[in-house]
Structure formats: structure tokens, C-alpha cells
């Protein structure tokens, strides 16, 4: 748990780049979040059919790309069914607003280059396609080690999927990991310990004095998603938690 003792990450983390102010999980979103003063970003990473890690939240492409028009209605909408060459041609910005039309899906390599060049930090949520949890964790971890080689602060890998974190741990145990929770299911603390995690990342409503004490007493850092109200953020600060993931890059000052 020594990594948790010397936690290098800031309190404020921009959700999917810049929350809802820009197309999520794009470099345009990262650039906008940075303009608001954020220095750490959260993003979702999955694999193309040919094993390229890229940013996308959903299992399917329709909500945040023009896949219906570009790929056609008769073809699979599942992102992981397509090679990167196909995915790279999609517009991942036009759905949000006309000003972002033409913004592509970024690879993890592109995001790493941007973050490293600007000394920004990254939280990679591993978002595997069902059935490929362990493999996705392995590949994302391998890429992360290669991309951040020689950098002072590696990315924080998180996932709701235990098998994805197992894959990351077994492949690159030196990378910091965090278990994502939407409920405090039976055995959550023991599972995080078994996975060698450094952090617990909860739905913010799950944190209270008891759960914070349990996690911190076991050596974990305590992070929350997705916090968009001032009262909720203040409650978490008062509880002594360590990190807040927010869409509201326009509301919260990361310097505060």
C-alpha cells in the first residue's frame, strides 16, 4: 500500500474529459477540461476487434458517433466488433454539437501523448466488452506501461469488472488500480485487497463515515463519481475523501 501513502493524484478529476461541455472521451474534451484548469482526466477505454485500445464509454457506437451513417444499419453496432481502421473514420463529435463535428475517436496512444506532453494525469476506466474482461485488462495495462515508461506518475487503472483488474494486476502489477463500485456489495473490501488496489472509487452517495473509515483503515484512497453539485462535493470533502470525479468542470475550481 505504499503507493496509496504517497498519492500523487489531485482531488479534482474531469469526467470523460470535460463532462457534458464537449463530446465525451475525445481530445477536444480533454482540451476544454484543461482550459478550465483541470490537470487530471477520467476516460473509458476498450479494445477494437484488432486489439487497439481506444476511448468509448458505451458497448455500442450509436450514441456518441455517426456509426449508423458510416457503417450502415445492417452491420454490428458493437464497437469491439470493428477494427480500428473502421472506428478511426467515425465522427465522435457531431452528435454533441456542430462545432465539434469531425472530432475522431482517440486511441489510448493519442491520449497518452497529449497528457504526457502537457503533464496531465489520467484515470483509465477499463470498459471491456462482456466476455473479454481479463484480456482487456491485460492489454490496456501493457499499453499503459509502454506509453508511460519513464514518466513520474503512471495512470490509475479502474474498473467495475473484477476480472479486468485481475488481468491488469497479473500483467503489470506495478500500475496502481482502483475498484469501482455502484453498490457496496458483500466482500467489496476484501476483493479490493485481493486485487492489490490502491483506491476505492464509489458512487458518491455510498460514502459515509463508516464506509470511508473502513476503506481508509484498510489503506485505500477514497474517490467518488460523478459529483456535480456543490453540496455533494462539500460533503465528500468533509468526510475526508481523496478524489472527486465531476462533469461540472465549469462549476468546480480544481485549485480549490
Identify the residue ranges that each predicted region occupies.
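Phosphate-group recognition and catalysis centered on beta-loop-alpha active-site segments
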Residues: 1-256
Amino acid at each position: 500500500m505504499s503507493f496509496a501513502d504517497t498519492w500523487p493524484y489531485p482531488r479534482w478529476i474531469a469526467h470523460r474529459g470535460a463532462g457534458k461541455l464537449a463530446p465525451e472521451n475525445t481530445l477536444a474534451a480533454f482540451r476544454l477540461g484543461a482550459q478550465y484548469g483541470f490537470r487530471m482526466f477520467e476516460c473509458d477505454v476498450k479494445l477494437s476487434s484488432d486489439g487497439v485500445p481506444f476511448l468509448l464509454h458505451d458497448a455500442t457506437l450509436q450514441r456518441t458517433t455517426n456509426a449508423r451513417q458510416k457503417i450502415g444499419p445492417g452491420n454490428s453496432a458493437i464497437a469491439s466488433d470493428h477494427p480500428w481502421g473502421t472506428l478511426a473514420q467515425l465522427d465522435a463529435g457531431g452528435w454533441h454539437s456542430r462545432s465539434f463535428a469531425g472530432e475522431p475517436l482517440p486511441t489510448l496512444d493519442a491520449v497518452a501523448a497529449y497528457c504526457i506532453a502537457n503533464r496531465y494525469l489520467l484515470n483509465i476506466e477499463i470498459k471491456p466488452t462482456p466476455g473479454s474482461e481479463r484480456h482487456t485488462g491485460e492489454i490496456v495495462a501493457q499499453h499503459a506501461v509502454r506509453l508511460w515508461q519513464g514518466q513520474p506518475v503512471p495512470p490509475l487503472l479502474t474498473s467495475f469488472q473484477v476480472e479486468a483488474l485481475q488481468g491488469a494486476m497479473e500483467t503489470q502489477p506495478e500500475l496502481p488500480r482502483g475498484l469501482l463500485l455502484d453498490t457496496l456489495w458483500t466482500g467489496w473490501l476484501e476483493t479490493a485487497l485481493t486485487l492489490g488496489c490502491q483506491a476505492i472509487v464509489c458512487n458518491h452517495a455510498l460514502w459515509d463515515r463508516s464506509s470511508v473509515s473502513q476503506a481508509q483503515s484498510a489503506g485505500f484512497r477514497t474517490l467518488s463519481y460523478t459529483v456535480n453539485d456543490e453540496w455533494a462535493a462539500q460533503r465528500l470533502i468533509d468526510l475526508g475523501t481523496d478524489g472527486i470525479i465531476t462533469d461540472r468542470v465549469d462549476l468546480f475550481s480544481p485549485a480549490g
